[in-house]
Amino acid sequence: MSSSSSVHDKRKMLILWIGAVLVNIKSIFCDFTLDSAYAMATSYRNLSGDKMLLQMWEPHQTSAFIGTVLMKIFYLLTGGWDFSALFLQIAGVLVFGIATFFLHSFFRQYLPRDLTDYICILFLVLRPKQIPMIEFSNMLLLFSVLGSVFLASYFIKKKRVMLVLAALMDCLCVLSYPSAVVLCLFSAGLVIYFSEEKARDFFIFAGVCALSGAVYLSYLIFRSGTADLMLTVKSIMGSDDSHMRMIQSVYDYWSDTLRGVIILAAGIVLCCLLVRLKVLKTRDSRYAFVSAVFFVLSLAYCFYNEFVKGGYGSSCSFAASFFIIPMIVISALNLSKCSETEKCIYLTGIWTSAGLFLSVLVLTNLPVINVIGYMIPAAMVSLIPLYHIVPAADSEGTMRPAATLFVICFFFVLGRGILIQAYSDSTTMITGIENVVRKGPAKGIFCSYMEYYMTECNIREWDEQIREGENLLVVGYAVDSTEYMYRDSSVSHYSTINTATFNETLLDYWGRFPDKRPDVIAVACWYGELKYDEDSWMMQWIEENYPVRTDGSYFAFFRAG
């Protein structure tokens, strides 16, 4: 490779690293959603004295252990919650930055330097929900990637401490996302497949997981008692239908995926025709062209959703999800080009991602195509076979593998740079930023003008209508859970998830915890017009028991008298 070519490659890599850093800085200020608010509110409840798995019925509450510590530190330093969102966002970026450094040191031992850089850039840029805060989805990604790295390291170097660390990482995955028990099973399968002493290593792995689970369960029983703990678990399973799949909604979940499958099928047919007609002369050039067709079709579909349709819900995740599919397909077709060590790393990442996919699918209300966005470990290791698809540069100027990987990584960096996950839980382009939140926990977060204005109005009216420390219930279809923090309110709902359920289960909750019955109820409205079904059980109960109503701009406040 010539000196000028080497300098050119270094410049391209520097561009990607700078872009990845800028994306994370952008993400600190711009990518804050209702899921971010939910993570903050869960930690806030812990700090306010609500007992986990007793008074709290959030499905992901066990993931709050990192956020609770960080928010405790923040409160001790500042004495309030203003700017707390920014603090947690910065902490999340720093944690992933440190993890990226660790991953780089691991992959560098077995892979070429430029390939290692590309893999780590993907890890630094991609998130399941494209938000930087240390919340359950990011924790699941972080611990699963570390777990797969520890497993691969054990399979290669045979150091037993790595097997123990891998088991502990899987336990942390379960704390982050309870259904990640499925991931533990997949990891155990990897141990059986790769280990030379299969029985011994399986029992070591399973023993560490079982012992860790027993210790944590003992802690919960000690805090809550066996009867109360079992009752709470039963309540959690039956109280929140926002994360439960219903038969009638199966079509909604899979119809989104079907459109993507049609595009992929068209790509496969086109690729097969071109190869069959011998449009391309060599096998390697065919692989390269097949890859190009897949990626172009994927890119076109993503841009169609982002820019023609004006966003697709969690569009940034969707775009990443769709692009990951051809990466996995093409890499699997070219696995034979890899060394045995590379195959071990690849299969560990792919198998971990399969476990992640099923773990999330069990406990999510996302469309299936978005769940693929959790398969970031697969995207990372897919670069290994892709690196070998195109031969190195020769005298005729054949495209080098770095060019292919550069385009892939550049797409992800560019997409994460120009798209933001907005405060209102929508996806928009960075040009949609018009203002900044100036009060409350989200102070300092960039947003649209309406998001800024509505937050300002809500905080002002909260100060007028709600006394500090009162029991508060916020009712709406998409609740910003940080609203409970405006006046240090005690949460009167069993869950602060943004898609909380409002039904008769609340009466059971208040019956068990009378001190949680609301003093004031805030119902989403639009200048006096309620934005919640007035014929619902919740509104009928409010009107019967909380007849005194005061209308605000975006919330109506109800009191008993």
Q: Which stretches of residues belong to each language-model region?
A:
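Short acidic/glycine- and proline-prone juxtamembrane loop motifs at membrane-interface regions
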Residues: 132-141
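Perimembrane helix-loop-helix junctions
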Residues: 156, 182-213, 217, 243-246, ...
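Extracytoplasmic catalytic/substrate-binding loops of multi-pass membrane glycan-assembly enzymes
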Residues: 28-44, 51-70, 78, 82
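Extracytoplasmic
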Residues: 409-560
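Transmembrane-helix signature of polytopic, membrane-embedded enzymes
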Residues: 11, 98-126, 161
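Short hydrophobic alpha-helices at membrane interfaces in multi-pass membrane enzymes
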Residues: 146-172, 199-207, 290-292, 343-353
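Membrane-interface transmembrane helices that cradle and orient dolichyl/undecaprenyl
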Residues: 108-114, 145-163, 195, 329-342
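Membrane-interface alpha helices of multi-pass inner-membrane proteins
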Residues: 128, 150, 162-178, 184-189, ...
